[in-house]
Swiss-Prot record:
It comes from Caldivirga maquilingensis (strain ATCC 700844 / DSM 13496 / JCM 10307 / IC-167). The lineage of its organism: Archaea, Thermoproteota, Thermoprotei, Thermoproteales, Thermoproteaceae. InterPro entries: Ribosomal_uL16, Ribosomal_uL16_arc, Ribosomal_uL16_euk_arch, Ribosomal_uL16_sf. NCBIfam families: PRK04199.1-4 (NF003239). Pfam families: Ribosomal_L16. The keyword Ribonucleoprotein applies. One of its GO terms (biological process) is translation. GO terms for cellular component: ribonucleoprotein complex; ribosome. One of its GO terms (molecular function) is structural constituent of ribosome. Keywords: Ribonucleoprotein, Ribosomal protein. This is Large ribosomal subunit protein uL16. Belongs to the universal ribosomal protein uL16 family.
């Protein structure tokens, strides 16, 4: 079955995170949540921070989050080297997405159950995020803040929710 469009999963219902009860839950497809200069002593010289803040609440599937991470990391590692930035994804995709598969062909009413046993099969994972929460941060030196902003702008294009990029000093980050 192909992947359903993101509009099917954009709205928040309730979190479904208990992996103990979910058999066959898909794994998280994001290999790394921290990239670049990950050691604390290497990050001491970074004074500027670019923050990607979500403006509307909703769900972001792990596919979109991984695409955003790849775009930001690819740009930053090409323009700067890995030791000149720190990229971190703040949120973790705990929510498991289920799908009650429906057949759409002639005679399908004899093959499927309809709404009987409509719990669904786990098909993916997502982040449930509230308005104003931080999704990604990039720490850089002052001279590289335009590159951090461009990286988050490229990542923002891959996300289904509207986002805002904020530029701050390292000591002023909230939430």
């Amino acid at each position: 079955m192909p992947l359903r469009p993101a509009r099917c999963y954009k709205r928040i219902k309730r979190p479904y995170t208990r992996l103990k009860y979910i058999h066959g839950a898909p794994y998280v497809q994001i290999p790394r949540f921290e990239m670049g200069a990950t050691k604390a002593k290497d990050r001491e010289r970074f004074t500027s921070v670019a923050v990607l803040r979500v403006l509307e609440g909703g769900q972001i599937r792990v596919n979109a989050l991984e695409a955003a991470r790849q775009m930001a990391y690819k740009y930053l590692s090409k323009v700067l080297t890995d030791q000149n930035f720190y990229l971190k994804i703040i949120k973790y995709p705990h929510h498991v997405i289920r799908e009650n598969k429906m057949l759409a062909m002639a005679g399908a009413d004899r093959l499927q159950e309809g709404m009987r046993l409509a719990f669904g099969v786990p098909t993916g994972r997502a982040i449930q995020i509230e308005p104003g929460e931080v999704l990604m941060i990039v720490e850089v030196e002052d001279r590289n803040i335009t590159h951090a902003k461009e990286a988050l702008n490229r990542a923002r294009a891959k996300l289904p929710l509207p986002c805002r990029i904020e530029l701050t000093r390292k000591s002023v980050i909230k939430g």
